[in-house]
């Protein structure tokens, strides 16, 4: 598919939502409906020295811009590709004497592009940045205060020789960033590393049970010949069959919240009241709050356990932030034990604890206990998420890897195969995560064949292999959730 080609969609007025996009042809699961390059994008302030400012990949060794000493790149190819967007920024940073925050940098990049190309539609865009929603009129007192600070800082940073924009227009751009900023992740999809504006994506409306997902692809510059390079882009991918004329939707937030909580988040962050079927009917809310059936606990017991779980999660967050991982495990075990006679395995409080416990225990290399919690977590997720949900796929992948580390080769292989099937739909076969998962799938398949042929020899060979190479340690647990689709200023 040509990036920027939009023949598969058209803009229409969606009832109760304003503008939206609908399909002009039929699509099936895993189809890429459109791909779009960022209009403008920047790396987060905290990662400017660790992430390429062109492709947003994490690298150990990056080349620094020799002039401003701020921008970092994988290599000369990425640096050359970045120059058009970095040229004005480079001069402005040198003159300003310091690096402004990511919001200021992104606003400036957008306006330098407007200065170069005008305010009309650019190639492949169905909407200009001028016509994107800003919701400035809905900002609360604190947001208005932050906006004034951002505008003042921007005016100090913006070069006097560049085109001068009105205060109203500058405020509009900051509003656009606030409402339409899309989170950019690293090449493994595990960490949010930046934020970008994708105008066409801004036309896709929300649904808590969507028919599409959005995936960030960092592109590939590794080939010797530039003709084989692929560009950094987002891809809108179908999660199942989509009929011609059907509205295209994505979920702006994680589904695993009560409908009332999702609606509250959406109202606060995106200024609209969600009227999707799952919110109107409270679908799956009963599972999110499910209690044991036999014997069924009283409402008072359930209420007390909810409060106890909330208090424990607060203690866990504090312990995690301080790196006290053994304390985290202790708190999880105690709370899960108390929840056992009260909550069912789809209860959100159970699932949150299972997720934390499996992640932290994997990091501590206590794989046997971690694998038990991971299996319970996946069983619960499978009853709640859409079968092709990207977050489900990532969770199943991690659970499969944990079970493989624990020596549960059959369970681990089964989970990795399941995760691979999901990620083929949500990420596509060429995404780095999917490629990693394919390598894992092939390895576990080979080991499973050996296991079935001679279980004793398999365990002897596995033990020898693990003794002769460093154990792969899971990433250190983070308090940060998995990267959300849309970026909100903290």
From Swiss-Prot:
Residues engaged in binding S-adenosyl-L-methionine: 17-19, 135, 205-206, 270-272
Any coiled-coil regions, as ranges: none
Tissues expressing this chain: Expressed in cardiac and skeletal muscle, lymphocytes and thymus.
An example molecular function term from Gene Ontology annotations: zinc ion binding
Domain of life: Eukaryota
Signal sequence, start to end: none
Annotated phenotype, changing residue 95 to R: In strain: C57BL/6
Location in or out of the cell: Cytoplasm; Nucleus
Keywords: Cytoplasm, DNA-binding, Metal-binding, Methyltransferase, Nucleus, Repressor, S-adenosyl-L-methionine, Transcription, Transcription regulation, Transferase, Zinc, Zinc-finger
Catalysed reaction equations from the record: L-lysyl(4)-[histone H3] + 3 S-adenosyl-L-methionine = N(6),N(6),N(6)-trimethyl-L-lysyl(4)-[histone H3] + 3 S-adenosyl-L-homocysteine + 3 H(+)
Pfam families: SET, zf-MYND
CDD domains: SET_SMYD1 (cd10526)
UniProt domain SET: residue ranges: 7-253
Chain intervals annotated as zinc finger (MYND-type): 52-90
Function: Methylates histone H3 at 'Lys-4' (H3K4me). Acts as a transcriptional repressor. Essential for cardiomyocyte differentiation and cardiac morphogenesis.
Protein family per UniProt: Belongs to the class V-like SAM-binding methyltransferase superfamily.
Assembly and interaction partners: Interacts with HDAC1, HDAC2 and HDAC3. Interacts (via MYND-type zinc finger) with NACA isoform skNAC.
Domain notes: The SET domain is split between the S-sequence (residues 1-49) and the core SET domain (residues 181-258), however the two segments still come together to form a conserved SET domain fold.
Protein name stated in the entry: Histone-lysine N-methyltransferase Smyd1
Organism: Mus musculus (Mouse)
């Amino acid at each position: 598919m040509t990036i920027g080609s939009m023949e598969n969609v058209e803009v229409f007025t969606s009832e109760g939502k304003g503008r939206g996009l609908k399909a002009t042809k039929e699509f099936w699961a895993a189809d890429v409906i459109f791909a779009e390059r960022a209009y403008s994008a920047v790396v987060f302030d905290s990662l400017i020295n660790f992430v390429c400012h062109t492709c947003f990949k994490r690298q150990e060794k990056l080349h620094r811009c020799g002039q401003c000493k701020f921008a970092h790149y994988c290599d000369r190819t990425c640096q050359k590709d970045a120059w058009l967007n970095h040229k004005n920024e480079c001069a402005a940073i040198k003159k300003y004497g310091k690096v402004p925050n990511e919001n200021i940098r992104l606003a400036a990049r957008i306006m330098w592009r407007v200065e170069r190309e005008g305010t009309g539609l650019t190639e492949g865009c169905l909407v200009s940045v001028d016509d994107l929603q800003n919701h400035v009129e809905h900002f609360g007192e604190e947001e208005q205060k932050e906006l004034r600070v951002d505008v003042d800082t921007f005016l100090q940073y913006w070069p006097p020789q560049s085109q001068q924009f009105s205060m109203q227009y500058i405020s509009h751009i900051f509003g656009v960033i606030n409402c339409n900023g899309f989170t950019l992740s690293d090449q493994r999809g595990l960490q949010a590393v930046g934020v970008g504006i994708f105008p066409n994506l801004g036309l896709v409306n929300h649904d808590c049970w969507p028919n599409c997902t959005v995936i960030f692809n960092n592109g590939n510059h590794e080939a010797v010949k530039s003709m084989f390079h692929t560009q950094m882009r987002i891809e809108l991918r179908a999660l199942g069959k989509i009929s011609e004329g059907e509205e295209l939707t994505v979920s702006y937030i994680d589904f695993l919240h009560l409908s009332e909580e999702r609606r509250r988040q959406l109202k606060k962050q995106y200024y609209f009241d969600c009227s999707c079927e799952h919110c109107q009917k409270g679908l799956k809310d009963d599972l999110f709050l499910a209690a044991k059936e036999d014997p069924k606990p009283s409402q008072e017991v359930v209420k007390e356990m909810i409060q106890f779980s909330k208090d424990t999660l607060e203690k866990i967050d504090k312990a995690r932030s301080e790196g006290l991982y053994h304390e985290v495990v202790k708190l999880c075990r105690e709370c899960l034990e108390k929840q056992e006679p009260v909550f069912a395995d789809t209860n959100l409080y159970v699932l949150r604890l299972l997720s934390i416990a499996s992640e932290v225990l994997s990091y501590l290399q206590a794989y046997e206990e971690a694998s038990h919690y991971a299996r319970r977590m996946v069983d619960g997720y499978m009853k709640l998420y859409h079968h092709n949900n990207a977050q489900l796929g990532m969770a199943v992948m991690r659970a499969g890897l944990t079970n493989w580390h624990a020596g549960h080769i059959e369970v681990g292989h089964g989970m990795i195969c399941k995760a691979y099937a999901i990620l083929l739909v949500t990420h596509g076969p060429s995404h780095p995560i999917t490629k990693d998962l394919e390598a894992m799938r092939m390895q576990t398949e080979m080991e499973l064949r050996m296991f079935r042929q001679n279980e004793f020899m398999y365990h002897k060979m596995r033990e020898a292999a693990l003794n002769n190479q460093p154990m792969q340690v899971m990433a250190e647990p983070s308090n940060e959730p998995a990267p959300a689709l849309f970026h909100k200023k903290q």
